[in-house]
From Swiss-Prot:
Location, primary (coarse class): nucleus
Organism: Sclerotinia sclerotiorum (strain ATCC 18683 / 1980 / Ss-1) (White mold)
Top-level lineage group: Eukaryota
Function: ATP-dependent RNA helicase involved spliceosome assembly and in nuclear splicing. Catalyzes an ATP-dependent conformational change of U2 snRNP. Bridges U1 and U2 snRNPs and enables stable U2 snRNP association with intron RNA.
Helicase ATP-binding domain location: 514-692
Binding residues annotated for ATP, in chain numbering: A527, K528, T529, G530, S531, G532, K533, T534
Group of enzyme by EC: hydrolase
Gene Ontology annotations for the cellular component aspect, listed alphabetically: nucleus
Name the record gives this protein: Pre-mRNA-processing ATP-dependent RNA helicase prp5
Gene: prp5
UniProt entry tagged with the keyword Nucleus: yes
UniProt-listed SUPFAM superfamilies: P-loop containing nucleoside triphosphate hydrolases
């Protein structure tokens, strides 16, 4: 402590009297600045080192009550005491000035040497080596032990001993800048081992030793804050306990410097924190102030600023790089003419930024090379572009809005329609060329003729077939009929299941069909309903499948059974289950209306048998480009109800499936009816078939009692109630199946029977498949004793205890009658089939009478008369006979659907284009020509062009607006009123005569509120959707508001086929009245547009779901 005081006293001798006298004032100002400085917060490393010196001196002199000023944070912290102590004699002014000039000259000489040496090192080793050397030098000078405190109070000794050390390290601007981070850089970046805390203490000791040589005589220098404002000021509160925090700050500062000059590319990204030019100037000013130099000339300033040349160049290069990046970004934001970005523009920015230098400095070149990675955080796009110069630039146009060529599609309706049709086109089944496939052979013939049949003669075989319900066979080498199950060539497992099911012996069709199928022949089997045709083709299929190798993961089924209805497919699948469990086989039932994903999952798990409908089979084959299943392994194909399968409704789909099956398959066709017209279609898929007919073609089983009654429509329901009452009085457990011709009729009859107390359910194609399945299950289980159905339940449905079948609506052909009646009297049981027929349905009498004759029952006299009357009309050409087959197929529905959608596209045009507006005007002109005059029923008109438009209505005619006729006045003149009266009488006469409207004049258009002009439009025979479109309140209100007319719906609705009685109301029509002909025409135009749209909507709905009814959501 004493040594420090002595040194301070020696330093005070160098000050003049004026400075000493100003100490009290400067103490107060110093305290105030010290208080401010402690509150301020900055982090300049050089100033912090000086603050360490100040703190050390402050702590040593704290016990002295006459302590000097607080060390100043800007210039290096001068410490002095206020009291005047004994000191050597004061030096003269000339000596002090000479000493200062000597110090300045020495400092300038050293700075020049350092500058020359740095330039040489820069040219030889580069910036990196120079910076490492500077750090090493600064660290080395700081880590040297400080000289001991002198004990002699000699001013000259102090000056002579300490001056070289002081000016060698303290007043070097680069050394001052590096000393603050020397310890951290040596510990981390440069690999030195000096502890941070010890280094701080050493630096503090060295600084406190040379305090007296740093003193500044000018008190005004402490007020300079413009250049030192960035330096840290929080120094007054720190003591020895604050050194740890100070070391942490030094470590943080070093981390920035280490990132600046490290060779790692990732660290270079943070080069923004390099020291800048103003900081270097601030250091130089601090050095000048510390030496008391005033009024330095420009040459001195230039020499002092030379130390910052390298950092200044680095900052300039970095600024140039940033400006170049900004120019590139601005250029990219500008719209380009061609969308290409030329990467050669980057060097031009370099040259522009560096125009001041004629030659490229090596340091600038080096920093320029390091500049590209620095620009990555600024713009990632530039970095990517620099690495992809050789690649084409087209992808950049995809992500920008500049110069994008947007070409509108051609709005040609034909092309758009073609594209839409192509997109809506269903996927076709992948075709398989079996000629190129090497498929393994399979075995067909499993039958060995039993010994009992070998010795039978031809006559004995014919007698046997005659006894078996008159079996008729056709074909070559037809096997002899068997008489028991053991002769069929079946395996033991099949025979065990047959025994458990209680089948004592085969039926007639089974006795002849099973040996023929087991022999590997293609078979056509026709037998009466309920004769066991399903078992006849199932048993040989099981034997056929078990003979082949097991399925692999990608294999499809081996046996394929197709049926026309979903209910029949479900029933066949149920009959397979007892055999499948015993033989370890798997079967899948696939039909429309059910969830397809479950069926696909079952097929992927593997199934030897698939029972399906043709439509769903095509969907499965086309699903997922044919990877769901395939028909390559199918060798056994069955078509149940083959007459319907080869009708025009199913034949295209069936043949599409057949074309994907191997040609040497075995094909079996079964049905209860097989018209002759179906033979040609059926036999083209068979090879040398065996035809088996049991009991005749299309014959009702003799066990069924057939009753045909000719009744009026209103009498049918009462007669039905009588039949149901008689049946359930005799047998409460009996079942009744009622057939109707339309879905709406089924639901109406259901409501009527429910009101009468009969529990019943209905089934038709308009219901969901889940409802249809549950209804049949409940009917079979006896939950409901009565079921109302359309012809979807006419084929294949097998229900025990079904005693009565009622044809509430007569079937339209013979085969349908046979299948309907065949739902009862199955498997040898008896049943009754009652058929109602009206006088208007004489065309159906021919098939019903023929069925009665073929089954050996008497034809009622009234039915026979109707048949003869219809045949006479056919001969005369008035009527055309129909067989019930040869429909138009499913392609008709697709064609109608496409035509309807095409018409809708023409009508519903979007506004906005002149061409479309012109087309709309043309459409309006066409609508103006639509007819409003109701023609008589007897008038001959051209066939309607739009599907659903009734005959007698011409929507392509002219709208005729009539002037309203007024009643004759009794006080008027006779001559003009006679004509009016006669016209009215003529009109009334015509209306009373025919009950129809004529010339567009309504029967009640005579009142005082009648408009001056009127027109009429008959809507009775249009579809329900069309009628609703022109009569609902919303549409009518819009027309009334737009035209100011009066629109009234008049007449009565008459169902199809019912004519207007004499004196009755006319058919349903719309009356439009208005004051002018123009408003009436406009209203009629709008009504006809709505009517036409409704008609097309009805036709489209019918095309989408041809078998649907009231349950279809459109």
């Amino acid at each position: 402590m004493a040594d420090a005081i002595e040194i301070e006293e020696m330093m005070l001798e160098d000050r003049d009297i004026a400075v000493v006298l100003e100490v009290p004032t400067r103490r107060r100002r110093s305290r105030e600045r010290d208080y401010r400085d402690r509150r301020d917060d900055s982090y300049d490393d050089r100033a912090r080192r000086r603050r360490e010196d100040s703190t050390d001196s402050w702590s040593r002199s704290r016990g002295d009550e006459n302590r000097g000023q607080t060390p100043r944070s800007d210039s290096g912290a001068k410490v002095h005491d206020a009291p005047k102590a004994s000191a050597p004699a004061a030096q003269t002014e000339e000596q002090k000035k000479a000493e200062r000039l000597a110090k300045l000259e020495a400092w300038k000489k050293k700075m020049a040497e350092d500058k020359e040496r740095k330039e040489k090192e820069l040219a030889a080793g580069g910036t990196r080596k120079l910076l490492d050397d500077i750090d090493q030098k600064a660290n080395g000078s700081s880590s040297q032990p400080s000289p001991n405190t002198p004990t002699t109070p000699s001013t000259s000794a102090i000056s002579g001993d300490l001056a070289p050390t002081n000016y060698a390290g303290k007043f070097d601007p680069k050394a001052i800048a590096k000393k603050a981070v020397a310890s951290s850089s040596s510990a981390h970046a440069l690999g030195r081992d000096l502890p941070l805390k010890e280094l701080s203490k050493t630096s503090a000791t060295l600084t406190s030793t040379v305090k007296g040589l740093q003193a500044d005589k000018k008190p005004t220098a402490f007020n300079s804050t413009s250049k030192v404002s960035a330096l840290p000021k929080t120094r007054g509160n720190l003591s020895v306990f604050g050194l740890g925090a100070k070391v942490t700050d030094n470590e943080k500062t070093y981390q920035k410097r280490a990132l600046d000059f490290d060779e790692d590319e990732g660290s270079r990204k943070k080069l923004e924190k390099l020291p800048t030019l103003p900081m270097a100037n601030s250091k130089e000013d601090d050095a000048a102030l510390a030496n008391g130099i005033e009024g330095q000339d420009d040459d001195d300033d230039a020499e002092l600023e030379a130390a910052g040349t390298e950092e200044e160049a680095a900052a300039a290069a970095r600024a140039a790089a940033e400006k170049r990046e900004e120019r590139l970004q601005e250029a990219e934001s500008q719209p380009h003419t061609n969308g290409d970005v030329h990467m050669e523009d980057a060097p031009q920015a370099d040259s522009t930024a560096m125009d001041e230098d004629e030659e490229i400095d090596p340091l600038d070149a080096f920093m320029e090379e390091m500049g590209d990675p620095f620009s990555l955080p600024k713009s990632n796009t530039t970095f990517v572009k620099n690495n992809t110069k050789s690649q084409p630039q087209e992808p950049e146009a995809l992500f920008g809005d500049d110069d994008v060529d947007l070409k509108a599609l051609d709005a040609d309706p034909d092309e758009i329609l073609a594209i839409a049709n192509k997109a809506r086109k269903k996927k076709d089944i992948p075709t398989i060329n079996y000629a190129n496939l090497n498929l393994p052979p399979f075995r067909k013939n499993f039958y060995t003729e039993p010994a009992e049949l070998v010795d039978m003669t031809e006559a004995e075989i014919n007698d046997l077939r005659l006894e078996l319900d008159g079996i008729k066979v056709a074909g070559k080498d037809v096997p002899k009929p068997v008489q028991k199950w053991s002769q069929c060539g079946l395996d033991v497992k099949s025979l065990d299941v047959i025994k458990k099911l209680g089948y004592d012996k085969p039926t007639s069709i089974q006795m002849q069909a099973i040996p023929a199928i087991m022999s590997g022949r293609d078979v056509i089997g026709v037998a009466k309903t309920g004769s066991g045709k399903t078992i006849a083709f199932l048993l040989p299929m099981f034997r056929h499948i078990r003979d082949q190798r097991p399925l692999k993961n990608s294999d499809g089924p081996i046996g394929l059974i197709m049926t026309p209805t979903r209910e029949l497919a479900t029933q066949i699948h149920k009959e397979c289950k007892p055999f499948l469990k015993a033989m370890g086989l798997r079967a899948v039932c696939a039909y429309g209306g059910a969830i397809i994903k479950d069926q696909i999952a079952d097929l992927k798990r593997g199934a030897e048998i698939i029972v399906c409908t043709p439509g769903r089979m095509i969907e499965l084959l086309a699903a997922n480009s044919g990877r769901v299943t395939n028909l390559q392994r199918v060798t056994y194909v069955v078509l149940d109800e083959a007459d319907r399968m080869f009708d025009m409704g199913f034949e295209p789909q069936v043949m599409k499936v057949f074309n994907n099956i191997r040609p040497n398959r075995q094909t079996i066709l079964f049905s209860a009816t097989m018209p002759r017209i179906m033979d040609a279609l059926a036999k083209k898929t068979l090879q040398s078939p065996v035809e088996i007919v049991v009991g005749g073609r299309s014959v009702v089983a003799p066990e069924i009692t057939q009753i045909v009654e000719v009744r009026e429509e209103k009498e049918k329901f009462h007669r039905l109630l009588e039949l149901l009452g008689e049946l359930y009085n005799a047998d409460e457990d009996a079942r009744t199946l009622i057939f109707v011709d339309r879905q709406e009729k089924a639901d109406d009859l259901l409501k009527d029977l429910m009101r009468k107390g009969y529990p019943c359910m209905s089934i038709h194609g308009g219901k969901d498949q889940v409802d249809r399945d549950s209804t049949i299950d409940d009917f079979k289980a006896g939950v409901v004793p009565i079921m109302i159905a359309t012809s979807v339940a006419a084929r294949g449905l097998d229900v025990k205890q079904l005693k009565l079948v009622v044809n509430f609506d007569a079937p339209n052909h013979l085969e349908d009658y046979v299948h309907r009646a065949g739902r009862t009297g199955r498997a040898g049981n008896t049943g009754t089939a009652v058929t109602f027929i009206t006088e208007e349905q004489e065309q159906y009498s021919v098939g019903i009478a023929k069925a009665l004759e073929q089954s050996g029952q008497e034809v009622p006299e009234r039915l026979n008369e109707m048949r003869k009357s219809y045949k006479d009309k056919v001969k005369s050409g008035a009527k055309k006979e129909s067989s019930g087959f040869g429909g138009k197929g499913l392609e008709r529905f697709d064609a109608e659907r496409e035509a309807t959608k095409a018409r809708e596209r023409k009508i519903h045009k979007l506004n906005g284009d002149d061409d479309e507006e012109e087309k709309e005007e043309k459409d309006d002109d066409v609508l103006l020509k639509a007819a409003s005059v109701v023609q008589p029923a007897s008038a001959s008109t051209a066939p309607p062009k739009l599907l659903g438009v009734p005959k007698g209505i011409d929507l392509d005619g002219d709208i005729k607006v009539h002037r309203t006729e007024t009643a004759a006045s009794s006080s008027g003149s006779k001559n003009p009123l006679d004509k009016v009266t006669s016209a009215i009488d003529a009109i009334n006469a015509r209306l009373n005569k025919t009950g129809q409207l004529r010339s567009g004049v309504p029967i009640d258009n005579k009142g005082p509120d009648a408009g001056a002009f009127h027109a009429t439009l008959e809507i009775n025979d249009f579809p329900q959707k069309a009628r609703w479109a022109v009569t609902n309140r919303t549409n009518v209100a819009k027309i009334l508001e737009a035209t100011g007319t009066s629109i009234t719906t008049k007449g009565s609705f008459y169902p199809a086929g019912k004519e207007v009685q004499a004196g009755g109301d006319p058919k349903l029509y719309i009356l439009v009245e208005g004051d002018t002909e123009v408003v009436v025409t406009n209203a009629m135009r709008e009504l006809m547009r709505l009517l036409k749209e409704g008609t097309m909507a009805a036709a489209d709905a019918e095309g989408r779901a041809p078998a649907s009814g009231r349950y279809t959501v459109t």
